[in-house]
Amino acid sequence: MMRNVTREATSLGLGLALAAGMAGCRVHVDKDANGEEKTVQVDTPFGGVHVNTDQITAADLGLQVYPGAVAVNDNDKHKSADVHLGFGQWELRVRAVSYETPDSAEKVTAFYKKGLGRYGDVITCQGNSPIGTPATTSEGLTCADNDKNANVKFDREDYGTGKDSLELKAGSKRHQHIVGFEHPKDGKTRFALVALDLPAVMDEGSGKSD
């Protein structure tokens, strides 16, 4: 989960600090007992990058934990990540946490279809293709909208699921709640809960956002 986003956000923040000659910049990095970066904060006069790992839960994303599910580490050695990039009016935030349960994916899917309902219509996706109806939320979100934001390219592998993974999605193109299913491990169902807040699309003529 978040293996690409966490690494790229950290690199971006450090690069910006170096580009600014460190004038007025503040860089702070905390590591865990294993030497892994746990928090990274880069603040500059024109914006900043904050990366926090293993500090959020499903509740922070506005969702319940599936009964009996436990948070698990992924290939990035973190159970969760909270990445926030803000530069003036341009802001991107990605929050994600991985869980596993011995129950079937069908049971987990049914649970989160109900849970995501608080955010409006829920669509079921296999990769970029919808399964059943609705195929689009009332706010215009589709299965193919993961990488269609004009200001940032984003795909499923950035938060831990695969290219053709099963996903449940709710919300709008800019504000999405996602339950993405990862490859099963040791006979257990693995899934990631994700909240995406993407940058507004700027109107070049007026300078206003959507």
Name every feature range the model reports, one short phrase each.
Residues 25-210:
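An acidic-aromatic pocket/loop used at catalytic or ligand-binding sites
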Residues 1-23:
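Sec-dependent bacterial lipoprotein signal peptides
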